[in-house]
């Protein structure tokens, strides 16, 4: 902080202070201009702060809507799959409600039910993994239960023990297989 200055005597002693009223006018004009600049800068800062708050609120709204969309997709995805399975359950219940059916009638009913279930799987992107003998072992789709010496190259599927399933491109359950350990 600067030391207080002594008041300037406003009585003209000589010609030096004769320009003081013009200097005061210049300083007053400069002060007014600086005040106007300050007010403009403060208004700009306030506007930018409001913009930041609006942007933050918009980002929060986008995040919330995205969460709601994910929740709805999950809910309705499950709903679609459930709707596909209802006819399968209906067929099984109808088969059980029939008294004294012959073995052939039961077999035909089970085949129809299996077709309905397969169609439900296909509609919901659920696909079977059923590697054939001689296929190359894929650790992303298969799970080797055992490895046995064989005439096949190593890591070749020898036997399918249980089918696997993928849903959309994600393995739901790997196929259980026996693989070749190579020639032993």
Swiss-Prot record:
<protein>
    <recommendedName>
        <fullName>Protein GrpE</fullName>
    </recommendedName>
</protein>
<dbReference type="Pfam" id="PF01025">
    <property type="entry name" value="GrpE"/>
</dbReference>
<keyword id="KW-0963">Cytoplasm</keyword>
<dbReference type="InterPro" id="IPR000740">
    <property type="entry name" value="GrpE"/>
</dbReference>
<dbReference type="GO" id="GO:0042803">
    <property type="term" value="F:protein homodimerization activity"/>
</dbReference>
<dbReference type="InterPro" id="IPR009012">
    <property type="entry name" value="GrpE_head"/>
</dbReference>
<dbReference type="GO" id="GO:0051082">
    <property type="term" value="F:unfolded protein binding"/>
</dbReference>
<dbReference type="GO" id="GO:0051087">
    <property type="term" value="F:protein-folding chaperone binding"/>
</dbReference>
<dbReference type="GO" id="GO:0000774">
    <property type="term" value="F:adenyl-nucleotide exchange factor activity"/>
</dbReference>
<dbReference type="GO" id="GO:0005829">
    <property type="term" value="C:cytosol"/>
</dbReference>
<keyword id="KW-0143">Chaperone</keyword>
<dbReference type="InterPro" id="IPR013805">
    <property type="entry name" value="GrpE_coiled_coil"/>
</dbReference>
<comment type="similarity">
    <text>Belongs to the GrpE family.</text>
</comment>
<feature type="region of interest" description="Disordered">
    <location>
        <begin position="1"/>
        <end position="26"/>
    </location>
</feature>
<dbReference type="GO" id="GO:0006457">
    <property type="term" value="P:protein folding"/>
</dbReference>
<comment type="subunit">
    <text>Homodimer.</text>
</comment>
<keyword id="KW-0346">Stress response</keyword>
<comment type="function">
    <text>Participates actively in the response to hyperosmotic and heat shock by preventing the aggregation of stress-denatured proteins, in association with DnaK and GrpE. It is the nucleotide exchange factor for DnaK and may function as a thermosensor. Unfolded proteins bind initially to DnaJ; upon interaction with the DnaJ-bound protein, DnaK hydrolyzes its bound ATP, resulting in the formation of a stable complex. GrpE releases ADP from DnaK; ATP binding to DnaK triggers the release of the substrate protein, thus completing the reaction cycle.</text>
</comment>
